[in-house]
């Protein structure tokens, strides 16, 4: 059923469990098949076993995140039948059999929640739309049964697509508006989760910022654009957080990138590149210029050869995640894959 009925969206691994979202119907386009979270036992890392599923009122469960302590998960809702989009908070006391704590569907979230990031007692929600009432919402989840919106931010110009929070900084992938950096507790600009303060922003002409990864030790932010072909990942130098600058890029023909994961200890970035599969790139050292012309790609794989993206078959990589030395990949067409790096 996970493969035959529903397309697969994002995923998250924690401990011995993997969670995968869904992105609509394979057989009946427009139906409410993207309403399911699947739960997988990955105790045997190379042989995931489906143990449970949770259904919500949504046509798309685009994102799933697990809090670092493993006690709570959040899934996002878009296109609900009742028009009350938002999120569902899950109790992971038994991680293989999650239970619903509450569905949170405040009017502020009615356009739909596309992505989420959990940081301690706060959840950062990406609300669909390119109007001031959309953008970022910060949710206090210290009492998960009674979430409370405590802050909002809209960067103007275009819609917010994703948020990544680390070291008290929120990195907003704000499409044509660019990358926006907020202080949400770092101290660099006096911000907090309940009162975010903009630190800086950078826009790249012709580039739609889809997602970001901040690597603090290296002083870089990696940006993706899922629209333009040939696809390009940009590297932004943020050693001076108040003045980000473009440092490098990595380009591939034929498709656009989607999500990615950086193994910071090894200096390897794993880029999910839709029908082009997964590409592992050496991002160690100083990054300048066109990385694709510097022999930095160390491996790539199209694990489902043939077919096309969003089709009955064929590689259509959504997102990689490094977990216990393996690369877990969600694929729109074919579900969850487990890859072993061999370099």
Report the location of each language-model feature.
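Feature marking well-ordered beta-strand scaffolds used for ligand recognition
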Residues: 1-343
């Amino acid at each position: 059923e996970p493969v035959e009925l529903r397309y697969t969206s994002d995923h998250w691994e924690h401990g011995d469990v993997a969670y995968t979202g869904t992105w609509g119907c394979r057989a009946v386009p427009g139906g409410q098949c993207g309403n399911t979270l699947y739960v997988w036992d990955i105790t045997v890392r190379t042989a995931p076993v489906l143990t449970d599923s949770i259904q919500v009122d949504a046509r798309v469960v685009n994102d799933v995140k697990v809090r670092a302590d493993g006690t709570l998960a959040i899934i996002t809702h878009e296109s609900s039948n009742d028009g009350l989009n938002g999120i569902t908070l899950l109790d992971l006391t038994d991680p293989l059999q999650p239970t619903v704590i509450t569905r949170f569907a405040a009017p502020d979230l009615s356009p739909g929640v596309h992505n989420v990031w959990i940081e301690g007692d706060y959840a950062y929600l990406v609300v669909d739309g390119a109007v001031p009432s959309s953008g970022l919402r910060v949710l206090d989840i210290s009492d998960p049964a009674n979430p409370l919106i405590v802050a909002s931010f809209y960067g103007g110009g275009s819609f917010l697509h994703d948020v990544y929070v680390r070291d008290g900084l929120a990195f907003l992938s704000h499409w044509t508006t660019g990358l926006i950096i907020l202080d949400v507790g770092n101290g660099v600009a006096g911000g907090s989760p309940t009162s975010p303060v903009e630190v800086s922003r950078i826009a790249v002409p012709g580039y739609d910022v889809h997602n970001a990864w901040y690597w603090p030790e290296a002083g870089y932010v990696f940006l993706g654009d899922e629209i333009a072909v040939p696809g390009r990942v940009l590297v932004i130098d943020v050693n001076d957080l108040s003045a980000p600058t473009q440092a490098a890029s990595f380009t591939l023909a034929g498709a656009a990138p989607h999500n990615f994961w950086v193994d910071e200890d090894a200096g390897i970035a794993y880029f999910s590149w839709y029908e082009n599969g997964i590409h592992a790139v050496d991002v160690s050292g100083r990054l300048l210029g066109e990385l694709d012309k510097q022999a930095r790609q160390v491996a790539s794989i199209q694990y489902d050869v043939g077919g096309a993206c969003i089709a009955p078959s064929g590689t259509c990589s959504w997102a990689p995640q490094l977990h216990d030395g393996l690369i877990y990949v969600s694929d729109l067409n074919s579900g969850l894959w487990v890859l072993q790096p061999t370099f």
